[in-house]
Regions:
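Ordered core of a single globular domain
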Residues: 2-16
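Cysteine-cluster motifs in flexible loop/terminal segments that predominantly coordinate metals
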Residues: 183-231
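Short Fe-S-cluster ligation motifs
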Residues: 176-180, 237-239
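Long, charged N-terminal interaction/targeting segments
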Residues: 27-171
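Short loop/turn segments that flank or connect secondary-structure elements
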Residues: 14, 20-25, 29-30
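N-terminal cysteine/histidine-rich coordination modules
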Residues: 214-215, 235-239
Length: 239
């Protein structure tokens, strides 16, 4: 995922972006289960009204790419948003060396991705679709009145990620309001998902003729996937 991480960092290093270091005490109250925020109780829905809405997670062992825990916001904060708008959330994880074989390492990475299903900030109802990488969020009127911010939400996510001893650093980005950027990031989310599916295909040890494999475009584009296939003992044909 390293090339994708570099692209994300370049794309989201926009002037005017707000950024905060990780502060566990700034995490919002977690309810332990997803809260039902009804339409009449919502101030607005991030990604609602057919706006783009995406999320994805990238993992790296390169500490230079993700050197610290940080929350970054590109766009208006929760209190400044007045209605449904484009939205995207991106998480970059720096992990330490994962022991075990490739399958165990891959399983560990997948478990990190599932953290997003275990964060339940009060007044912030996430609706995540793994099929199309969409993430819509209903924000309650009460949470807005109480001063909920993306700094709070980001700290809540990082706090949950830090429960995993394999994770060294977390950087989380929230993008709001910019349709073009959110559309681009939604496309990146699909690319990241394709990489993950290809890794899963390789880890299953499936021999394949590269000329007919549906994952060939991904292997051609992403450095290291073909080498991993060689390592698994299934030399691709017609490379």
């Amino acid at each position: 995922y390293d090339s994708t991480i570099r692209d994300v960092l370049s794309r989201l290093s926009a002037p005017g972006a707000k950024s905060w270091p990780y502060e566990p005490g700034a995490a919002w109250r977690d309810l332990g289960a997803n809260e039902l925020v009804l339409g009449r109780d919502a101030a607005y829905e991030l990604g609602g009204s057919n706006n783009p809405a995406g999320n994805f997670t990238c993992v790296t062992t390169d500490g230079l790419l993700v050197p610290e825990d940080r929350v970054t916001l590109v766009g208006p904060d929760i209190g400044a948003i007045k209605g449904d708008c484009p939205f995207c959330r991106v998480v970059l994880l720096h992990v330490n060396d994962i022991s075990g074989d490739d399958q165990e390492a891959f399983s560990a990475i997948r478990s990190m991705e599932f953290v997003k299903y275990h964060v339940f900030p009060e007044g912030y109802m996430m609706r995540i679709s793994p099929e199309n990488q969409r993430e819509q969020v209903r924000v309650s009127k009460q949470a807005v009145k109480r001063g909920l911010s993306f700094r709070n939400i980001g700290n809540s996510f990082i706090k949950k990620y830090k429960e995993n001893s394999l994770i060294d650093h977390v950087q989380i980005f929230f993008v709001t309001g910019d349709r073009a950027v959110c559309c681009e990031l939604s496309a990146t989310a699909k690319k990241v998902d394709a990489i993950t599916l290809t890794l899963n295909h390789i880890m299953d040890g499936l021999a394949t003729d590269c000329s007919v494999c549906s994952f060939k475009p991904v292997c051609d584009e992403v450095e290291g996937l073909k080498e991993l296939h060689f390592k698994k003992g299934e030399k691709p044909m017609n490379v």
